[in-house]
């Protein structure tokens, strides 16, 4: 079995384990980093550790490395202040999740594995608020387009994609 195939297998096994038995946490940045550590510890020595270099992808610049910690504090403090979006009606919930998705996507705190970490964290957060989301029903290409648009300040498509998948 090739190294690349082995890496894919390890990621799938860890994601499956996380789905079966979610990591306990209080939906703070430490919890977010713990999910990354859990998902990628078999692949990267630096799993769960913040990147120290600036990143961009497909024309999108992510949070400067030196700003990750202060930005994360703002994002996760706001999440706590909003009571983790519990008790919100569907439309308001989707609006908040869309905003949270955008801000954590911009944060992009790790060198690799940001998307999988973000989806795993969001799944747990959404479930804790009494909703669910099935990522397998989300068109990956459409999500990527929506994410790129959202990075440019246009969140309509992302809100629609997430809104249709959250129930």
Segments the model singles out, each with a brief description of its role:
Residues 1-5, 9:
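Single conserved hydrophobic/aromatic residue that forms the stacking wall/gate
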Residues 28, 32, 114, 118, ...:
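Hydrophobic (often cysteine-bearing) scaffold residues that line and stabilize catalytic clefts
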Residues 29-79:
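A glycine-rich, hydrophobic loop/mini-helix early in the fold
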Residues 35-40, 97-104, 143, 147:
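Short alpha-helical scaffolding segments that buttress acidic/His motifs in well-ordered protein cores
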Residues 39-45, 105, 126, 130:
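Short alpha-helix boundary/capping elements
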Residues 43, 148-167:
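Acidic, carboxylate-rich catalytic segments that either coordinate divalent cations
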Residues 64-108:
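Helix-hairpin-helix/helix-loop-helix acidic hairpins
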Residues 108-141:
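Short conserved catalytic/interaction loops centered on acidic-Pro-aromatic/His motifs
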